[in-house]
């Protein structure tokens, strides 16, 4: 039976959320009950989600608008074009935090709560309804244990943790099952070579509503919007993806086989570090890959599949 799933996403800044959502919608192991938008302009983020769901014939999935915190650049405007939430044929819930609480409390089975951005929505849901811990597993793309960005041999303050560190701390201290992919395993996920060529071919053959085309079109237009970012100076957008951190969290929503998982006591510091500390809460951390190529092949196969 498919696992009831909620995705909380800050889609609309880095493009990896788009790839992650497309992959999620091609994972039969996960039954998506709700998608909520996190931080920044959460209506803009919801519009991106809505357009993707509409194109992929998944307007059965409700969208919850999360707490609008911080400024964020609209890096996906070209792809979004003039689409707005009024065009979405599904349900839009203004109280995204309430929708998280209701969806978890009403679920018959444990929910995979997959979070691929900062987590103020989740901290607010815990404050409003602490009992969600009894019926949900937190799955996050968060932190840095032994390695940092670009495979640096030391941990770093990871974005999803540091921008709202106290919210993240509350989520990690909550008494529920916690599973994360830190930068150690998600910071080197790139589709390139033959895999990227297959994405391009599928996009051309299957048309703009296909997951491959949605990912590729967003990738190319996003790159034009952010090509001045220093980290992208050596990226050729026609031959490879950017780093697709969030894909690994989707996989952890239903499987762990390809990863080396370790239970560690994790403490989130006020300045956004993810520390191993005996006083921390137990978190299952994906520290290394058993077979990263198999994971990249799985993602590619599902994104190029026509059904």
Locate the predicted segments by residue:
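N-terminal acidic, glycine/proline-rich low-complexity segments
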Residues: 1-307
């Amino acid at each position: 039976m498919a696992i009831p799933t909620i995705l909380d996403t800050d889609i609309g800044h880095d493009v990896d959320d788009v790839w992650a959502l497309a992959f999620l919608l091609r994972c039969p192991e996960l039954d998506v009950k709700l998608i909520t938008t996190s931080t920044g302009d959460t209506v803009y983020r919801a519009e991106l989600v809505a357009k993707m769901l509409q194109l992929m014939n998944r307007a059965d999935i409700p969208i919850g608008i999360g707490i609008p915190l911080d400024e964020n650049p609209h890096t996906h405007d070209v792809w979004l074009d003039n689409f707005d939430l009024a065009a979405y044929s599904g349900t839009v819930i203004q109280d995204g935090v309430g929708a998280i609480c209701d969806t978890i409390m009403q679920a018959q089975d444990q929910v995979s709560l997959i979070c691929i951005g900062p987590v103020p929505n989740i901290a607010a849901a815990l404050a409003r309804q602490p009992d969600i811990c009894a019926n949900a597993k937190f799955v996050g793309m968060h932190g840095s244990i032994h390695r940092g960005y670009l495979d640096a041999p030391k941990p770093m303050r990871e974005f999803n943790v540091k921008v709202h560190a106290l919210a993240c701390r509350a989520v990690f201290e909550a008494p529920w099952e916690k599973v994360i992919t830190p930068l150690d395993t998600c910071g080197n996920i790139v589709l390139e070579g033959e895999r990227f060529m297959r994405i391009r071919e599928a996009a051309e053959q299957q048309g703009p509503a296909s997951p491959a085309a949605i990912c590729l079109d967003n990738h190319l237009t996003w790159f034009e919007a952010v090509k001045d970012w220093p980290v992208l100076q050596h990226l050729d957008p026609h031959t490879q993806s950017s780093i697709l951190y969030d894909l690994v969290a989707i996989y952890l929503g239903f499987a762990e086989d390809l990863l080396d998982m370790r239970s560690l006591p994790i403490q989130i510091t006020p300045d956004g570090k993810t520390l191993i500390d005996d006083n921390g809460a137990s978190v299952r951390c994906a520290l290394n890959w058993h077979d990263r190529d198999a994971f990249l092949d799985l993602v590619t196969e599902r994104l190029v599949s026509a059904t």
